[in-house]
Amino acid sequence: MKLIKNGKVLQNGELQQADILIDGKVIKQIAPAIEPSNGVDIIDAKGHFVSPGFVDVHVHLREPGGEYKETIETGTKAAARGGFTTVCPMPNTRPVPDSVEHFEALQKLIDDNAQVRVLPYASITTRQLGKELVDFPALVKEGAFAFTDDGVGVQTASMMYEGMIEAAKVNKAIVAHCEDNSLIYGGAMHEGKRSKELGIPGIPNICESVQIARDVLLAEAAGCHYHVCHVSTKESVRVIRDAKRAGIHVTAEVTPHHLLLTEDDIPGNNAIYKMNPPLRSTEDREALLEGLLDGTIDCIATDHAPHARDEKAQPMEKAPFGIVGSETAFPLLYTHFVKNGDWTLQQLVDYLTIKPCETFNLEYGTLKENGYADLTIIDLDSEQEIKGEDFLSKADNTPFIGYKVYGNPILTMVEGEVKFEGDK
């Protein structure tokens, strides 16, 4: 058994003194003071905040096929360092988990290497090509968390509709990277004033919002749970809000970088600032914040997307899309939104725990007696600088290097086992 002493937990929105007794994989007791019995391992939280473990429904672990960027082991170590105890990896790997054979191989890699709980997606279409549906019932039987072709949008309405019908039959979500290929125009950043200043092709807002508008109507017709990945535009927020008001089962996520940065933060032709969807305008960012606070957007997900340094050293027009986020999400959001009084600590924790779990009917995301001992101990008071050399991910492609942040996890536990502690 383990006993976390001298911690603070959120109760009714306030930090309260609490000890947590853990028996195996579950929390046995939470109380203001618990006397240790013989043989109990004591973990001294030293007055720090003990949070439910975070749940990230959108990460890229790159394995199999992209191990030079990230592996299941390094990606989940990075997740643990960031306080995440559950992650859901996208299927844009090689091979794609689009068959029982491929999914079984992926699951074995996870079983052998993962440092946190991993709930893998299966693809919607074979090889994510948008031409042939996968076998939904067979992949659900293997353990598919949900279905997505993330990395690309499903381009034809008929294929998306047929996929939604199949997903509804097996009671799983369709999770969509919304991007109309006919509207990308070879873009490498947001189509706006900054792209014009830099002379870089831009991706317009409608590239995303048009596909969401199509899909919410398809989801209504199919009776399917439809989840929108990494919402980035004000038009998308409006479409999702209207769909929810109409009673359509649509949910959505937003990334930390879209909440924190805009096109105005891009200093020049620097691919560290290249992600998909791109950093949008100030108006878009404000709409995302409003949508998160009013419940239009359900949760926060990182879209952790590691790449090799030489790949991101290329010009924006040639470099791959994506930034890492597992190790920086909570500190950045805590520093920029909670420390300055825009959000409460409870709000932020909910966006990373209860909200994603409610979105996908997961049994995690809370600290409660008889619940899983998934938790992270966080130092809310000490300032640290974000440094790439401190990352446990293979990659450090993020524009937040050098930022000074509070709220750094110092210990992460998954089902009662310590998976990250300090610099270990």
Curated annotation (Swiss-Prot):
Entry binding sites for substrate: H60, L61, R62, N92, N276, H307, F321, G322
Family matches, as Pfam families = Amidohydro_1 (PF01979)
**What Gene Ontology cellular-component terms does the record carry?**
cytoplasm
MF (Gene Ontology): allantoinase activity; dihydroorotase activity; zinc ion binding
Query: What are its E.C. numbers?
Result: 3.5.2.3
Catalytically driven reaction(s): (S)-dihydroorotate + H2O = N-carbamoyl-L-aspartate + H(+)
Q: Which family does it belong to?
A: Belongs to the metallo-dependent hydrolases superfamily. DHOase family. Class I DHOase subfamily.
- Name of the protein this chain belongs to: Dihydroorotase
Q: Which species?
A: Staphylococcus aureus (strain Mu50 / ATCC 700699)
